């Protein structure tokens, strides 16, 4: 069983709500294969580092999200101070961090060090959970800005590497740097140096977000998306009148990077599964069906963010003035680490999971990990998984 937690900045708090309900309803359930992309890497790393059953782990995850504030993610200052610091270095000797990205994220590193690390920078507890057999692999997805490749960093037992022209994997001992890199929203947060290269958000070029879990041997994948599935009527509704504001354009770009790929990959997996069902085993070329369940918000998280737009301060207030207003400020929903918004998303996630209890229970039935020999046959290299 694999768990995929996709990106979306502050939207990832929605996943914490879903997981909290799963922990309460299925406390003995475990996900041996964890994959995190973008802010989903924080949630995946939390599950991979903390001991206890699913209920205990998810309760601590929710507590961590409820504690977070904008000042725990990026340097919080007035919009005027931010503009001055971004445009002009205060001294010749000052590091040029603020020119590498709009926001400086050293507070997030400090926060993650307190929550996930043993003080050395390594993710505490992962080795113990691997040794106990509770965990098979933890994977964190990043983008190598130097090569343009999607790089998946994996800590696990006897994991075979994969390599394609545009996506590769490396076996390693995961650290806070890997989590920071995966969550580094392009242009907004600075890239993170790992070795000789700089890495950013794992969703930038990730055309097949389900692929890492499949490579790692998952025969079932539960994916928690942060994208609301609009109805046709909602999709046809104009978001603004006149020329599109910068916020609308930027939001669409962010959605295309972090939210749209999972839907396309899920559709491709469904088609491949249907095709394999029609073929005898000897003609499947080593491929096998992979069961998939995607859970997603019942409401538009961007529209929820609009309720808080008038209350933001610091850099977000300046961004709001520059970007203009829209009915669904998706860009804001990714940066709005305010307690009220985070709490609301956790509540929505919990309620959504509870209302889909029967569907989830049916999917989780008989969720046993396949033998390793079979897991190696699970590489799904058809269309959509060979980018």
Residues of each region from the PLM?
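Catalytic nucleophile serine of serine hydrolases
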Residues: 38
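Residues forming the Rossmann-fold NAD(P)(H) cofactor-binding site
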Residues: 41
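Patatin-like phospholipase
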Residues: 1-35, 45-387
């Amino acid at each position: 069983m694999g768990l995929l937690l996709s990106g979306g900045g502050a939207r990832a708090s929605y996943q914490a709500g879903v997981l909290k309900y799963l922990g309460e309803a299925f406390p003995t359930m475990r996900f041996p294969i964890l994959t995190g992309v973008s802010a989903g890497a924080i949630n995946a790393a939390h599950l991979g580092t903390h001991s206890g059953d699913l209920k205990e782990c998810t309760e601590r995850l929710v507590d961590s999200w409820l504690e977070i504030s904008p000042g725990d993610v990026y340097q919080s200052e007035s919009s005027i101070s931010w503009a001055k610091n971004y445009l002009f270095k205060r001294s010749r000797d000052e590091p040029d961090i603020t020119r590498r990205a709009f926001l400086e994220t050293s507070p997030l590193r400090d926060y993650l060090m307190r929550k996930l690390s043993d003080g050395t920078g390594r993710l505490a507890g992962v080795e113990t959970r691997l040794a106990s057999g509770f965990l098979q692999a933890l994977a964190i997805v990043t983008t190598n800005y130097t090569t343009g490749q999607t790089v998946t960093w994996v800590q696990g037992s006897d994991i075979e590497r994969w390599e394609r022209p545009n996506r590769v994997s490396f076996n390693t001992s995961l650290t806070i740097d890997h989590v920071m890199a995966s969550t580094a929203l392009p242009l907004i947060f600075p890239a993170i140096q790992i070795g000789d290269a700089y890495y950013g958000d794992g969703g930038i070029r990730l055309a097949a977000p389900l692929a890492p879990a499949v490579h790692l041997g998952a025969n079932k994948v539960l994916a928690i998306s942060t994208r609301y599935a609009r109805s046709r009527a909602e999709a046809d509704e104009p978001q603004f009148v006149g020329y599109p504001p910068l916020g609308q354009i930027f939001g669409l770009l962010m959605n295309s990077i972090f939210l749209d790929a999972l839907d396309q990959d899920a559709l491709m997996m469904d088609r491949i599964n249907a095709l394999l069902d029609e073929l005898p085993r000897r003609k499947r070329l080593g491929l096998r069906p992979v069961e998939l369940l995607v859970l997603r918000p019942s409401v538009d998280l961007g529209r929820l963010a609009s309720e808080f737009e008038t209350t933001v301060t610091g850099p977000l207030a300046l961004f709001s003035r520059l970007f203009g207003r829209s009915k669904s400020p998706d860009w804001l929903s990714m940066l709005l680490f305010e307690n009220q918004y985070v709490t609301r998303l956790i509540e929505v996630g919990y309620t959504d999971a509870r209302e889909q209890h029967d569907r989830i229970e049916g999917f989780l039935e008989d969720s046993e990990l396949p033998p390793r020999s079979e897991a190696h046959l699970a590489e799904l290299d058809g269309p959509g998984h060979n980018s």
